[in-house]
């Protein structure tokens, strides 16, 4: 049975459509093939292994909760583990959605075609619809593999721990594992569709220069939001559920993580009326996210190809960018020399590259969150620390060069001339 399937897969990959799908898959997960790339990239094996780690570690974090000996020692007898495990179900849902959302935001530029794709594929006798369908197929395959990889370990171990504590049979374990797999997979796919739909809609509606200007900040907002979702997973959904029971019209009902928690409990027949109501929002919410993703993908694909032909203005020609540079130049040294030149060059390099802008925007977002939660005296210190941390991360990211730079600076290592510029 396997050899015919293997032969069919090999023949499919050798077709022009199969080669296109393989090309787009490699571009989604390639590691270090593009010298001008500013992303921190990993190979396929390292990426899949890294993405599987959070779920695996989380399983062993919650293992003591389902120890039969500890339950007996604490005097907890005859517990309904389908209800006891509710916070952990929410934790795994939040973890799956967080990892999926962060990777989708970071890989956003690799999902749509870039100038290299157009220059390589446009001269070939291939219809644009075939290229679009091949890219869509590659995205679907990548999302499916990604969803399975992120949730593979928790799908086995978490139901095993819960059913072992409840001392039930194999049938209940299989049912629990199937329910867990369905809910976390649906949450993973929904997160990808939602992030893609929102970013794609902004890309399709906003002018190209406006989207390029605000893309880094929008992605940073998504990253901060997903980090907050992860924190809520460790704190538990109890506060959300209490607020929802007290105020059914609360904005909390629009949290997708609670939708899938309600679906989880409904499939196991342990849902409260509030959770049962939230479970009904999974279908319309998922359908809306998928529809927006398909529409924005088609429009964004066409606009990205048009952008390659038309080109774009340099960042230095944009008015807002020029005003920001003039303001930041006020912090440089007044006297001409290496320190002033190094400061001006570093500022422009940090604001020019997408990865550096995202790093700074995430630091500013976390700083705002820390300032909102801390008192008036501690807020400036927390914000300044996170901003310095974001700058330090930005210094470690490589800056992509659009052309070969012929200028070099020869420095005396004993003078440490770059330190004053970095401090400014």
What are these regions, as identified by a protein language model?
Residues 1-101, 146-391:
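Transmembrane alpha-helical segments and their membrane-interface loop/helix boundaries
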Residues 103-124, 391-410:
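Transmembrane helix boundary and interhelical loop/hinge segments in multi-pass membrane proteins
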Residues 111-112, 121-134, 139-140, 204:
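A conserved hydrophobic secondary-structure block that centers on an alpha-helix together
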Residues 126-130, 314-323, 412-413:
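Membrane-cytosol interface motif
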Residues 203-207, 408, 412-418, 424:
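Short, well-ordered loop/turn and helix-capping segments at boundaries between secondary-structure elements
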Residues 358-360, 374-377, 395-400, 404-406, ...:
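Extended hydrophobic-aromatic, low-complexity segments
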């Amino acid at each position: 049975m396997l050899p015919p399937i293997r032969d069919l897969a090999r023949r499919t990959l050798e077709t022009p459509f199969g080669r296109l799908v393989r090309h787009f898959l490699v571009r989604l997960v390639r590691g270090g093939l593009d010298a001008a790339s500013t992303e921190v990239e990993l190979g396929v094996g390292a990426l899949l292994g890294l993405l599987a780690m959070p779920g695996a570690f989380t399983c062993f974090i919650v293992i003591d909760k389902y120890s039969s000996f500890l339950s007996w020692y604490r005097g907890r007898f005859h517990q309904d583990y389908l209800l006891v495990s509710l916070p952990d179900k929410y934790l795994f849902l939040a973890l799956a959605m967080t990892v999926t959302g962060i990777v989708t935001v970071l890989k956003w530029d690799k999902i749509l075609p870039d100038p290299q794709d157009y220059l390589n594929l446009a001269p070939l006798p291939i219809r644009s619809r075939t290229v679009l369908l091949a890219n869509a197929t590659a995205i679907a395959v990548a999302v499916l593999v990604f969803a399975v990889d992120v949730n593979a370990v928790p799908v086995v171990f978490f139901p095993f721990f819960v059913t072992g504590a409840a001392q039930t049979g194999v049938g209940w374990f299989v049912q629990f594992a199937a329910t867990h797999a369905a809910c976390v997979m649906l949450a993973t796919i929904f997160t990808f569709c939602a992030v893609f739909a929102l970013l794609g809609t902004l890309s399709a509606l906003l002018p190209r220069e406006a989207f390029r200007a605000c893309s880094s900040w929008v992605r940073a907002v998504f990253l901060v939001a997903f980090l907050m979702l992860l924190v809520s997973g460790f704190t538990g959904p109890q506060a959300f559920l209490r607020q929802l029971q007290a105020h059914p019209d609360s904005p909390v009902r629009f949290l997708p993580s609670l939708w899938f928690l309600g679906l989880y409990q409904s499939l196991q027949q342990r849902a409260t009326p509030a959770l049962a109501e939230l479970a009904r929002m999974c279908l319309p919410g998922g359908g809306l996210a998928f529809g927006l993703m398909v529409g924005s993908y088609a429009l964004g694909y066409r606009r990205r190809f048009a952008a390659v032909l038309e080109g774009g203005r340099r960042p230095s020609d944009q008015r807002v960018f020029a005003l920001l540079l003039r303001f930041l130049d006020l912090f440089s040294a007044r006297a001409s020399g290496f320190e002033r030149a190094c400061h001006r060059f570093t500022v422009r390099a940090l604001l020019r590259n997408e990865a550096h802008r995202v790093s700074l925007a995430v630091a500013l977002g976390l700083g705002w969150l820390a300032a909102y939660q801390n008192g008036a005296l501690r807020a400036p210190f927390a914000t300044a620390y996170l901003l310095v941390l974001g700058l330090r991360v930005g210094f470690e990211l490589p800056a992509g060069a659009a052309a070969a730079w012929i200028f070099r600076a020869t420095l005396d290592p004993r003078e440490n001339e770059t330190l004053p510029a970095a401090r400014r």
